[in-house]
Amino acid sequence: MPRRPSGGGGGAGPAAAAVRKVPLRKLLRAASVACGVQFGWALQLSLLTPYVQELGIPHAFASLVWLCGPLSGLLVQPLVGHLSDRIAPAASPLGRRRPFIAAGAASIAAAVLTVGFSADLGRIFGDSITPGSTRLGAIIVYLVGFWLLDVGNNATQGPCRAFLADLTENDPRRTRIANAYFSLFMALGNILGYATGAYSGWYKIFPFTVTPSCSISCANLKSAFLLDIIILVVTTCITVASVQEPQSFGSDEADHPSTEQEAFLWELFGSFRYFTLPVWMVLIVTALTWIGWFPFILFDTDWMGREIYRGSPDDPSITQSYHDGVRMGSFGLMLNSVLLGFTSIVLEKLCRKWGAGLVWGVSNILMALCFVAMLVITYVAKNMDYPPSGVPPTGIVIASLVVFTILGAPLAITYSIPYAMAASRVENLGLGQGLAMGILNLAIVIPQVIVSLGSGPWDQLFGGGNAPAFAVAAAASFIGGLVAILGLPRARIASRRRGHR
């Protein structure tokens, strides 16, 4: 695989480069689709693990449902990135990235409708509406929608990241700013999504969502997904109309899409042999970081409902306590997103001052401390005397919310720095930005597969609950932090304004 010239090449002279320098305000609009995508993702993270347990899947197997996310991401995001790299910019009136962004958004809209109405569709397929019964039809419909939702998420976010990388022309500073904009919109989508999930009165605003097969909690979820579609359509239109895609790139891939194309998987995995040590370090730290994040993503609100509020989604006598905990967890995730947004604003200054590697490493160690704090809170709550149907002590709830909030800072860094570092370091390998984002995605989804497969056995091995997964998360985050501090550059990537390695 040939290296491309460090100047960007492709016959584009200085004038073309000047034309391609997109104003920051247009980069801001180009990143806005992250708000719509993340709104639905926030609902997925906060509400769907509890909801699938309501449908009848046991807690020990709930993590297996999330396998569809990393498995679809394992192929969908690299494939979409590869295909968008190969499209000649002039071949489509929307360029080469925006058609995939629009198609992914349409998939998300179809998916959330399927998930939201899964209980009603399950009733059509013969499900019982008796409380506590397993609804096989609804589970099947839910799984189809869940898979489609993850495919849509991967098909949208990958091309959007590559779109931003194209617009910034691999300038490290502008790339970090563009990814910070993306993180800022993700934070806004998170805030809106988690606030929507924390509100329990949507069924009153949309009374048609309550049906014999869809209880109040189900109707609230259904209403939230209807709001998601509105926000997704608006933000997708803003992104697609924001800026014209560059007509010239640093590689001749797009100019000759029908020649010299290697088989996709061979190109994806074969590119590994060209990676330098710094690229491998970025991928290793990314993998360890996501081994840390995924247990929290899977079980954050479930942890609040089970361990803190002592409820259960499959025991009618304490179901209300569980839902109260889930809503409180959604509120905590909303606070998390506020800090995420603030961190996204100041992240560029932090990287300039301390270096991207050090900032990333310190954030991972902070993650580890937060997960250890969750284990301590779990232990303290378990040994306190309050009834399952009662309200947990205020101190325990506040401590849990503080941990949820603090985790917003490292989450903002996870959403930004790995992508910026990958974009600036992989460019000279002869890869398009779409495939580069797909390769980074492998370092995200493979750890998610490991956690999804391991969470159930860890749960059963240690007597149930979410503590074992959080212990693994703490260890992986701490190791990832040390590797980032010792193995990634501190100042070099932050001090360079232009050019390539």
Swiss-Prot record:
Gene Ontology biological process terms, A to Z: sucrose metabolic process
GO molecular function: sucrose:proton symporter activity
Keyword annotations: Cell membrane, Membrane, Sugar transport, Symport, Transmembrane, Transmembrane helix, Transport
Tissue specificity of this protein: Widely expressed.
Record protein name field: Sucrose transport protein SUT2
Location of this chain's protein in the cell: Cell membrane
Source organism: Oryza sativa subsp. japonica
Pathway as given in its UniProt record: Glycan biosynthesis; sucrose metabolism
GO (cellular component) term, any one: vacuole
